[in-house]
Amino acid sequence: MIVGIGSDLCDIRRIARTLERHGARFTHRVFTDGERARCDRRAARAEGYARRFAAKEACAKALGTGLSAGVFWRDMEVVNLPSGQPTLRLAGGAAERLAELLPAGHAARLHVSLTDDPPMAQAFVIIEALPVSVAG
């Protein structure tokens, strides 16, 4: 069953300006070490950060909290499955909120779709609760 849906659009130009103005102060506040390493080794650095920023916003919406109620930017990390498919790893307040959304005997599966078509980046997040025997 679906327990949360979120989407977000992010202007890549805004992220590029923020990177120019605030650099590491911005990236260290919003992104995990792994996300920074992945984005910083690419030529399209702003696009990578914008996709991840949109994913975090979409996840916060899917959790039903936004970036409040103890959910912080770095509680949500965009990672890739072995197949290359993006997903989210949650920690701290985001993981706690996710646990509150799940019915007893269910585990979460987070579905993430990321795209960009400059100047915009977009993300969708769906939180699915699956019975533990199926989620395995």
From Swiss-Prot:
Pfam families the UniProt entry points to: ACPS
Keyword Chaperone appears in the UniProt entry: no
GO cellular component terms listed in the entry, alphabetical order: cytoplasm
Protein location: Cytoplasm
E.C. number: 2.7.8.7
GO biological process: fatty acid biosynthetic process
Protein name: Holo-[acyl-carrier-protein] synthase
Family that this chain belongs to: Belongs to the P-Pant transferase superfamily. AcpS family.
Function: Transfers the 4'-phosphopantetheine moiety from coenzyme A to a Ser of acyl-carrier-protein.
Cofactor(s) the protein needs: Mg(2+)
Alphabetized InterPro entries for the sequence: 4-PPantetheinyl_Trfase_dom, 4-PPantetheinyl_Trfase_dom_sf, ACPS, Ppantetheine-prot_Trfase_dom
Residue stretches in coiled coil: none
Keywords per UniProt: Cytoplasm, Fatty acid biosynthesis, Fatty acid metabolism, Lipid biosynthesis, Lipid metabolism, Magnesium, Metal-binding, Transferase
Gene Ontology molecular-function annotations: holo-[acyl-carrier-protein] synthase activity; magnesium ion binding
Organism of origin: Methylobacterium radiotolerans (strain ATCC 27329 / DSM 1819 / JCM 2831 / NBRC 15690 / NCIMB 10815 / 0-1)
Residue numbers binding Mg(2+): D8, E57
Record's keyword annotation contains Transferase: yes
EC main group: transferase
Catalytic reactions on record: apo-[ACP] + CoA = holo-[ACP] + adenosine 3',5'-bisphosphate + H(+)
